[in-house]
A protein has these predicted regions:
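Exported/periplasmic ABC-transporter solute-binding proteins
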Residues: 21-291
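Sec-dependent N-terminal signal peptides of Gram-positive bacterial secreted proteins and lipoproteins
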Residues: 2-22
Length: 291
């Protein structure tokens, strides 16, 4: 009786192992997951991968696959990919660096990491910007910006997985003792590190609250210009139309854009060109992804 039970247990474990290590079905249709229009991550991604082109008038054309699943926000991209073994998406490196619900794909043989962004070998990287409508006049907002760009603020940026812009001449921060609320709004990718910066700043200035609103990069720039936000957030370089309108960007750190798939997917490496073909709909089946 015991032998039969043991044999049954061995068979069950063998079956489980076989399922766990079953080869991914590459005949599956690729489920492309993209960010919504106005997303700074999307804007940077389509530019860096060649998905965006120029028309005859020199205007940018976004050639993202029309059948893609367009979702709002970084967390929803991650959730969508984690729940579909045929899905592929992209997200801020800092948001997936320690997330095992999705798998980061190498790009041109290079892993997405802060080290590879710093040494310029990872090809899909972009700046994180804070945005104002010119020179700040609000003392509290100015002080918070000073903290972000200080040694202490840049340490928070580094701890969040970004490449900081600090150097040997970066000043230390001295608590100001100011009171009030700083309203910051924009990129959903920048928002997590901004929340941590706000917490660190408030710890030094207990009577200050930093209100971070994640609304998207374009909304962040527009909000900084029209006064909705004291400080905007953009997870991309500012457009000429935005700077012409008075927007001023300050880079607080560099972030990679990780291409992510479901952990069940056997794909490990894609070239930038292959990524482009997938996200424009030229390649629609996983079996053709590495061709």
């Amino acid at each position: 009786m015991k032998i039969r039970k043991l044999f049954a247990l061995v068979l069950a474990l063998t079956a489980i192992t076989a399922v766990a290590f079953a080869e991914f079905d590459t005949s599956k249709t690729i489920a492309v997951v993209s960010r919504e229009e106005g997303s700074g991550t999307r804007g940077a991604f389509i530019e860096l991968t060649g998905i965006a082109t120029k028309d005859a008038d020199g205007k940018e054309v976004d050639n993202t696959y029309i059948e893609a699943d367009f979702v709002n926000g970084t967390s929803l991209v991650i959730t969508t990919v984690s729940q579909n073994d045929a899905a592929i998406g992209y997200a801020s490196l800092s948001s997936v660096l320690h997330n095992d619900t999705v798998k980061m794909v190498k790009i041109d043989g290079v892993e997405a990491s802060t080290e590879n962004i710093l040494n310029n070998t990872y090809p899909i990287a972009r700046p994180f910007n804070i945005v104002t409508n010119g020179e700040l006049t609000n003392e509290l907002a100015k002080d918070f910006m000073a903290f972000i760009m200080s040694k202490e603020g840049q340490a928070v940026v580094a701890e969040d997985g970004l490449v900081p812009v600090a150097n040997d001449e970066t000043p230390s921060y001295t608590a100001s003792g100011l009171k009030g609320v700083v309203v910051v709004g924009g990129s959903t990718s920048v928002a997590p590190v901004m929340e941590k910066l706000g917490e660190a700043y408030a710890a030094l200035n207990p009577e200050v609250e930093v209100d971070v609103q994640a609304t998207g990069s374009s909304a962040g720039v527009a909000g900084a210009l029209d006064g909705t936000y004291m400080i905007g957030m953009a997870s991309r370089a500012l457009k000429s139309s935005e700077t012409d309108g008075g927007a001023v960007g300050t880079v607080i750190g560099l972030d990679g854009i990780a291409v992510i798939v479901n952990p069940a997917n056997s794909i490990e490496d894609l070239s930038v060109e292959q990524v482009k073909k997938i996200f424009t709909g030229e390649v629609t089946v996983w079996a053709d992804a590495n061709k």
